[in-house]
């Protein structure tokens, strides 16, 4: 193939460096970065969940909660399984709402999906709250064991975890 430069001298295309040569490798790099970010986000969420819910939930229940978090992350919020705290300490509705908000914020999911996720995960604890109420009150800042944790811009890490 031939192409013409401003000087009108024909130059073979192979002599011009191909700007698109790295296109595929750049796409692959971006995909790998995204996969790593998603993995790192899920690790941070799991560590946060263990720290914030261990006094309320059994190991088995936390494992179910992990699966439910994967469901919400994969846009399968209706696949969430119910959890019922069997420990003495009961997790409060505000704590559950804040937990849903904090996790959902890291995953970038809608308030509606956060409400469905937490209601599906804790139907007994949230038996007096409907989806609309939960959706509207996820971020209402009331004193409880699990405070709202707003992530820093562009970051998924949680604050105040040991």
Predicted regions mapped to residue ranges:
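Short, small-residue-biased leader/transition segments that mark boundaries at the very start
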Residues: 2-4
């Amino acid at each position: 193939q031939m192409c013409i430069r401003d000087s009108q001298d024909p130059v073979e295309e192979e002599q011009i460096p191909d700007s698109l040569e790295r296109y595929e490798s750049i796409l692959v790099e971006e995909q790998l970065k995204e996969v790593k970010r998603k993995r790192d986000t899920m690790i941070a969420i799991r560590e946060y969940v263990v720290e914030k819910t261990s006094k309320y939930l059994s190991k088995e229940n936390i494992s179910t909660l992990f699966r439910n978090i994967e469901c919400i992350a994969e846009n399968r919020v209706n696949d969430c399984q119910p959890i019922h705290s069997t420990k003495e300490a009961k997790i409060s509705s505000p704590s559950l709402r804040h937990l849903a908000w904090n996790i959902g914020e890291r995953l970038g999911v809608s308030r509606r999906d956060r409400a469905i996720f937490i209601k599906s995960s804790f139907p007994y604890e949230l038996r007096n709250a409907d989806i609309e109420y939960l959706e509207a009150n996820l971020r209402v800042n009331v004193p409880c064991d699990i405070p709202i944790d707003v992530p820093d811009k562009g970051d998924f890490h949680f604050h105040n975890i040991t």
